[in-house]
From Swiss-Prot:
Its main location: cytoplasm. This is Diaminopimelate epimerase. Belongs to the diaminopimelate epimerase family. Its EC number is 5.1.1.7. It is found in: Cytoplasm. The lineage of its organism: Bacteria, Pseudomonadati, Campylobacterota, Epsilonproteobacteria, Campylobacterales. One of its GO terms (cellular component) is cytosol. PANTHER family: DIAMINOPIMELATE EPIMERASE, DIAMINOPIMELATE EPIMERASE, CHLOROPLASTIC. Pathway: Amino-acid biosynthesis; L-lysine biosynthesis via DAP pathway; DL-2,6-diaminopimelate from LL-2,6-diaminopimelate: step 1/1. HAMAP family: DAP_epimerase (MF_00197). The keyword Isomerase applies. Substrate binds at N11, N60, G70, N71, N181, E199, R200, G210, T211. One of its GO terms (biological process) is lysine biosynthetic process via diaminopimelate. It comes from Helicobacter pylori (strain Shi470).
Length: 273
């Protein structure tokens, strides 16, 4: 079994083709492990589709499945083109979402995430029990729960430096309380937003999260009147351009091919596949 590793906005993914739909949870846990596997934020299984160029199953590094991953969508789009699975402009199925891909330059990929849902606005009072004394999060008056393929809780701080002082235990508590990824952001100007994401399935801060950046972008647009196009800068410092067109979210940014890995028979013998 051959795995291809791609990176987008600081997220890295292993991509593999399969001609049959199976449960790849155990395989994902093993191959995504940073010390005992190849190391990745997630595993993308590319599957044949009757109605689309292809479809995928996406697994987090802990083996859990997710319906959508924004940066992985751009990575798999480039993979599909480079491996003659699809043309430069194509559409694939991610869970129940149709994702359109446009390859504008050799490694600049735009993907259409589709629409979003504002699930709830949450006053800080509902979250105070999760905060420690002198918590940075106490300065956030309102949190926003937004579905961009997966649920995200978004809050904005007034000081960029506070992004470096976030408490992992607090974010973990919020993640379990709302069953959502947690994003804390700072609007530097109307067109530049910095953020940190605590991600489900990874259970820690990640260098980037595409659907998290989308949720922050939407919250900033709706509640802080930012423009319909902005640069989102995650922990990796790899900027991603997000835009809103006809109420749908578009990502645009660079994707890098890292390399190829081959799975040995030992994994099969251990029952991981």
């Amino acid at each position: 079994m051959v795995f291809y590793k791609y990176s987008g906005s600081g997220n890295d993914f292993l991509i593999v083709q399969s001609f049959k739909k199976k449960d790849f949870s155990n395989l994902a846990k093993q191959v995504c492990h940073r010390h005992e596997g190849f190391g990745a934020d997630g595993l993308v299984v590319v599957l044949p589709s009757k109605d689309y160029d292809y479809e995928w199953d996406f697994y987090n590094s802990d083996g859990s499945k997710a319906g959508m991953c924004g940066n992985a969508s751009r990575c798999v789009g480039l993979f599909a083109y480079q491996h003659a699975i699809a043309s430069k402009n194509h559409v694939f199925l991610a869970g129940k979402r149709e994702i359109s891909i446009c390859i504008e330059e050799p490694n600049i990929i735009e993907s259409n995430l589709g629409n979003y849902k504002i699930l709830d606005t949450i006053p800080a009072l509902r979250c105070e029990k999760f905060f420690t004394n002198d918590s940075v999060l106490e300065n956030i008056p309102t949190f926003y729960l937004i579905d961009t393929g997966v649920p995200h809780l978004v809050g904005f701080v007034k000081n960029k430096e506070w992004l470096n002082s976030l408490n992992t235990l607090e974010l973990r508590a919020l993640r379990h309380a709302f069953n959502a990824n947690i994003n804390i952001a700072f609007i530097e100007n109307k067109e530049t937003i910095f953020l940190q994401t605590y991600e489900r399935g990874v259970e820690d801060f990640t260098l980037a999260c595409g659907t998290g950046m989308a949720a922050v972008f939407i919250a900033a647009r709706i509640f802080y009147n930012t423009p319909e196009k902005a640069a989102l800068i995650p922990k990796s410092s790899e900027s991603l351009e997000l835009s809103l067109k006809n109420d749908e979210i578009f990502y645009k940014g660079a994707v890098r091919y890292i390399g190829m890995s081959v799975l040995g028979m030992s994994v099969f013998e251990n029952g991981c596949f």
